[in-house]
């Protein structure tokens, strides 16, 4: 029971960062097009193209 709780807690803590994507209104066709957009708007180059729009995280 303790092991299950620890695993569940670890998964929860690790998943916190995954849900911090910031959608933008910039259209894209590939993720590399989002890198300069994310850098200029949020200061980070982490981004991806999702459904034709850039998501920065």
Swiss-Prot record:
Q: Which Gene3D superfamilies match?
A: Knottin, scorpion toxin-like
Q: Name one GO molecular function term.
A: ion channel inhibitor activity
- Pfam families in the cross-refs: Toxin_2 (PF00451)
Q: Where expressed (tissue)?
A: Expressed by the venom gland.
Instruction: List UniProt keywords, sorted A-Z.
Output: Disulfide bond, Ion channel impairing toxin, Neurotoxin, Potassium channel impairing toxin, Secreted, Signal, Toxin, Voltage-gated potassium channel impairing toxin
Where is it predominantly found?
Answer: secreted
One GO cellular component, as annotated = extracellular region
Which branch of life, at top level?
Answer: Eukaryota
Could you say which residues form the signal peptide?
1-21
Q: Where in the cell is it found?
A: Secreted
The record's disulfide annotation reads: 28-49, 34-54, 38-56
Domain description: Has the CSalpha/beta fold, which comprises one or two short alpha helices connected to anti-parallel beta-sheets stabilized by three or four disulfide bonds.
Instruction: Say what the protein does.
Output: Blocks human and/or rat Kv11.1/KCNH2/ERG1, Kv11.2/KCNH6/ERG2 and Kv11.3/KCNH7/ERG3 by binding to channel outer vestibule (S5P domain) with a 1:1 stoichiometry. Also has a minimal effect on rat ELK1/KCNH4 potassium channels. Has been shown to weakly inhibit Kv11.1/KCNH2/ERG1, Kv1.1/KCNA1, Kv1.2/KCNA2 and Kv1.3/KCNA3 voltage-gated potassium channels.
Family of this protein: Belongs to the short scorpion toxin superfamily. Potassium channel inhibitor family. Gamma-KTx 2 subfamily.
Q: What is this protein called?
A: Potassium channel toxin gamma-KTx 2.2
């Amino acid at each position: 029971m303790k092991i299950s709780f620890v695993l569940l807690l670890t998964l929860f803590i690790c998943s916190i960062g995954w849900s911090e994507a910031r959608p933008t209104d910039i259209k894209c066709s590939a993720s590399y097009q989002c890198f300069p957009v994310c850098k200029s708007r949020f200061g980070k180059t982490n981004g991806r193209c999702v459904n034709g729009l850039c998501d920065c995280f």
